[in-house]
Amino acid sequence: MFGIGMPEMLIILVIILIIFGAGKLPEIGGAIGKGIKNFKKASNESEEIDENSRPKKIEPK
């Protein structure tokens, strides 16, 4: 995962814990989760728009 192993992830987590404190972590996690959910929803909607905007083939008579 981007060359980041478990020890590096733990160090990053400890630094975040020190900066924001234990009380803010659930708030931050919820905000990140909502952001990811909205991003996925928007990307799925753009795929649906692309499929609907394709011109339909008209067959000659």
Swiss-Prot record:
Functionally, this protein is described as follows:
Part of the twin-arginine translocation (Tat) system that transports large folded proteins containing a characteristic twin-arginine motif in their signal peptide across membranes. TatA could form the protein-conducting channel of the Tat system.
Q: Tell me the GO BP annotations in alphabetical order.
A: protein transport by the Tat complex
Which superkingdom? Bacteria
Task: Write out the transmembrane intervals.
Answer: 1-21
Entry's Gene Ontology cellular component terms: TAT protein transport complex
UniProt-listed InterPro entries: TatA/B/E, TatA/E
Q: Where is it localised?
A: Cell inner membrane
Q: What is this protein called?
A: Sec-independent protein translocase protein TatA
Q: Which family does it belong to?
A: Belongs to the TatA/E family.
Recorded topology in the membrane:
Single-pass membrane protein
- Its source organism is Syntrophus aciditrophicus (strain SB)
